[in-house]
UniProtKB/Swiss-Prot annotation:
This is ATP-dependent RNA helicase dbp7. ATP-binding RNA helicase involved in the biogenesis of 60S ribosomal subunits and is required for the normal formation of 25S and 5.8S rRNAs. Residues 16-34, 66-90 have a biased composition (Basic and acidic residues). It comes from Schizosaccharomyces pombe (strain 972 / ATCC 24843). One of its GO terms (cellular component) is nucleus. SUPFAM superfamilies: P-loop containing nucleoside triphosphate hydrolases. A motif (Q motif) lies at residues 138-167. It is found in: Nucleus, Nucleolus. It catalyses: ATP + H2O = ADP + phosphate + H(+).
Amino acid sequence: MADEPLLLNFVVDNAQSRKPEALKSSRRWTDRARDRKRQKRNSNESSKSTVKRNSGTNGASTDYKNSQKEKVINPVFDPRKPAHELKGNKRDNTFVTSLFTGDDSEHFSQDVGQNLEDNQISNIGTTKEASNAPIKTTNFAGVQLDTQLADHLNNKMNISAPTAIQSCCLPALLNTDDKDAFIEAQTGSGKTLAYLLPIVQRLIRLPKNLHTRTSGIYAVIMAPTRELCQQIYNVANKLNNNPLSHWIVSCNVIGGEKKKSEKARIRKGVNILIGTPGRLADHLENTEALDVSQVRWVVLDEGDRLMDMGFEETLTKILSYLESQSSIIKKDLSIPSRKVTMLCSATMKDTVKRLSDSALKDALYLKSSIVEETNDGYSQAPEQLLQRYVVVPPKLRLVSLVALLRSHVRSYKKIIIFLSCSDSVDFHFEAFRCAINADEMEEAVKEKPDSEGDIISNAPALRIDGKSNVYRLHGSLSQQIRTSTLNLFSSSEDSGSHILLCTDVAARGLDLPNVDLVVQYDAPFSTDDYLHRIGRTARAGHNGAAIMFLLPKESEYINLLKSSVSANILEQPNGPSGLLSAGFSQGKTNTNDWQDRATEWQLELERFILENEPMRNIAKRAFTSYVRAYATHLSSERSIFNMRDLHLGHIAKSFALREAPGKISGANSSKPRKQGGSVDKGKSKSSKDIAALMHRKAMEHYSTEHNIG
């Protein structure tokens, strides 16, 4: 009998019929888990390829992500090539996202081009009478000022009449009752001269034998920032540049300057000593030649900021030391027979009241009768100041700022832009001055090359209009650069516009002449900061305008400003679309070509950053610092400025970055990693430790920006 034939069944192995291999029990559990994940991933990829084959070529299953985002790497950069012709390798994680789609909060008006003048801030004036202007109905003779000093003010300093706060302070401080004084006045109302004029007038009435720099220190003036100290020093020098008081010598002691030079000036003799609390305390402790036994006036300028910046303990030590060293011998003179303390502040809040209670005794309360008090006791902004705000989606912030500047550089000669951190100042400075397209490169060639290694603090704003100059100022710059930048910006009188990018280091006390517009690109960290920022314009009776950028989730901040500082602030007509159309439209047109031009401007900068690694690093640092600074808003305002409401991808877009936020932060991470790639988190911290760390970091930020000491 023949053998039965052998039948063999062959089954073709494919992805769908393949079963996972049995895992060996002898292997480690981590290896088995890794194998399961790999098998699951291979199975998913196989199913995706099957769906793709079944879909055919009719284009019915278009990849949604590819329709929304274009991945590019190392684009072929040509500054003269239109944005839509950009070619790139599609293997990177960078994205080109649109500015004008996908955000319901944009609310673009379709008829903004019909009346471009309505989008101009300068087109809308105010008819209110200036609340900080010199009083025309009086003169300095009517407030007991010496005739020769009044003539000097009129002829050399172009000041013909006192302001309201000066009219209030001069008679009281020239009086021989010699009481302590609390001076409260609006920003830009002339507080510096309100206390300097009485000091100088009473010093010039001293006997002739005391008219020398070696007769002693008669006045000590403290201010929170180096820039404000330098400004007070300059005003004192101008005031004393006359035959009556030419012998009065002022000295400025601030951080960033050589202590050896300051000690040499003190040894030669000083009559008015001006300084920051930190540096002044250092000299009181370590400079033997500093004799404060004859001090008759102690002035605390910007008292609210002195307290906010953590100077309370330092101020207490300084005041106690001055009191202990006081040994006034000659009392029958024109100067006070006791040490008189004056506290100046634009706001009257709890911290200032606490300082007033400890530093002042039986003090006079001096305040302009023009200023009306709010319910909370805070002072208002000048009446003639036009205040606006605009709600801008995060990805449109950069082009909206550029549009605002482009539409106003012709009518406004000096513009100040406040940002939240120094890294953001550096980014916008570089973004505005860089040469990208052919016209900008041609303008850049005309400029003289800077010497290698120099830090540039001012340059032509090629990305705005080429005719304007842009400046930067923040606490990380050296004192020499900060001083020269302020001097250049203040003294500039040419036909072009001048734009100062700065942090809050320039928000307090600085009297920058003829500032027409203040832009708060980043919201202030407190309502007091808002008041002082806008106080850089509309000073001494001049008109001025201020506009603040807010994100859609931050609009509730307007109600807080109205209730806390009585801000008379209005919304900018037509919102961001009005700004963009005014800045990017060519002529009066009804078309929306401004959207294309704004997009082109943004994409040109993005391509430039992709090709330029140093600029890309600057943008990354600015993004990271902005997010960190955003987290330092007051706890009472945390519901308005909530970190969870930030769209980090759109915020990155406002810094011209195409990388995902996670990739940006990862590039800057310096945390040690364990073997295997996990981050060593270390010991977890309690909520109290984290809160204390945040407070300490905030104070370090203040110290850096304002250069304490």
